[in-house]
Curated annotation (Swiss-Prot):
Residues 1-25 are annotated as: Disordered. It holds the Pfam family F-box. This is Putative F-box protein At4g21240. It comes from the Eukaryota.
Length: 417
């Protein structure tokens, strides 16, 4: 197998158009790109979509070397805000369909990018965390799958092996250490006796699950279909439950946990004293936010200082109702799914699949809103093609501020030679 065939197998981009390209066309293409100054090549490649950047690896050994360097891959994962998208993941039958909806389209109607990937044998429905630099993680109980939709790749991690076999759930979160440029999966097993068993897996060759020593007694709440955690600035945040004893009686308290991905240390964070029942975490422009919403307003607390545990309150009255009320413009139910990193706009999507799928971006500071209708999502043809109409169970998960990644998952489970 030559280098190009290896590249096609690794990236999943070995499609007919590339494989059948004649040597004459490749030679002509190479001569054109030889005219480009060397110092401009990385900047040009960083502006391309992931699919194009991967295919341009056939131009020359130099271009292959540039696009596979760790520095280039890392830079590609932090694009300008205009390239961020709202990604939908449809799980139905034995496949996952990843749909990218660009967050900064100017028009009222926009096209979408699609990528369909066959699921591995054990592919569970629940997402474990938000998109982390283009990677997403799904898992439940004993199977954890990390996906890179841009490279059309996924890897199923080995089953975590805790100390005890008597456990009743496992929760996992994907995190990123920006200092050492490492991705880690945190997995915590819960037991009926209230103990815990935290493990961590670094994405890379010759790695395995490691026990995290000296961690506190905490148990992540079984959150069902909602995400367990979110990664912000090298820390994974997730909701947890701690147990303590008062007068020989065990009590429980719901708190937030912070996990330092680099140093693998835990820290407890006291949640704001807010009586609202509908609570959830979001990344609010690079800070952890604890959202407390009702059907006409959004109130959220922003963690300004994690060490001092200082929260600031923000409160906004919405000009439209939130699910379960029917919005008169959407003519269906809408729900909050995220906040744009750059502009701080709230992202509202259809809570149910409508014939015309729309996303509403609302700027709470200016009170302005923009509505984008995305073609080919939610209509009958879409439901037939994805198999939704035939499935008794399917899910659609949303990942705001998703970006493309060139990180390869092929060698994650590779053993030493």
């Amino acid at each position: 197998m030559d280098r190009r065939e290896e590249e096609e197998e690794e990236t999943g981009y070995g499609e007919k158009g590339t494989r059948n390209q004649s040597k004459e066309d490749e030679s002509r293409l190479g001569k054109i790109f030889e005219l480009i100054p060397l110092d401009m090549i990385p900047d040009i490649l960083l502006r391309l979509p992931a699919k194009s950047a991967v295919r341009f690896r056939i131009v020359s050994k130099l271009w292959l070397s540039i696009t596979t360097r760790p520095y280039f891959i890392r830079s590609f994962a932090f694009p300008s805000s205009t390239r961020l998208c709202l990604m939908a993941c449809v799980k139905a039958r034995d496949m996952r369909l990843f749909i990218s909806l660009h967050q900064h389209d100017d028009g009222s109607y926009a096209h979408v990018d699609r990528c369909e990937i066959k699921s591995p044998k054990h592919d569970y429905y629940n997402p474990s965390s938000e998109s982390v630099n283009g990677l997403v993680c799904f898992g439940d109980f004993y199977n954890i799958v990390v996906w890179n939709p841009s490279m059309r790749q996924h890897v199923t991690l080995p089953e975590p092996k805790p100390h005890s076999t008597v456990r009743y759930f496992i929760r996992s979160c994907l995190g990123y250490d920006p200092v050492e440029d490492k991705y880690k999966v945190l997995s915590i097993s819960g037991y009926h006796n209230g103990n815990h068993d935290p493990l961590v897996f670094t994405l890379g060759p010759q790695e395995s699950w490691r026990v995290i020593q000296n961690s506190p007694l905490d148990i992540p709440l079984p959150t069902g279909g909602s995400r367990v955690g979110t990664c912000i600035n090298g820390h994974v945040y997730y909701e947890a439950q701690i147990r303590f004893k008062v007068d020989d009686i065990f009590n429980f308290e719901n708190i937030l946990m912070s996990f330092d991905v680099r140093y693998e240390k835990f820290n407890t964070i006291k949640k704001p004293a807010d009586p609202t029942l509908r609570n959830f975490m979001l990344n609010y422009q690079g800070k952890l936010a604890w959202f407390c919403s009702d059907y006409s307003s959004i109130r959220f607390w922003v963690l300004d200082d994690g060490d001092k545990q200082e929260w600031s309150l923000k409160n906004f009255i919405l000009p439209f109702p939130i699910s379960p009320e029917i919005d008169p413009i959407f003519e269906c139910r809408v729900m909050l799914t995220g906040v744009t990193h750059d502009t701080g706009e709230f992202i509202f999507i259809n809570a149910t699949m409508c014939d015309a799928f729309c996303v509403l971006y609302y700027d709470p500071k200016s009170g302005s809103e923009r509505r984008i209708e995305y073609e080919g999502i939610g209509d009958r043809e879409f439901c037939i093609n994805t198999g939704i109409l035939e499935c008794k169970r399917f899910t659609i998960d949303w990942f705001p501020n998703h970006n493309e990644s060139l990180m390869s998952l092929v060698n994650v489970l590779k053993k030493a030679d």
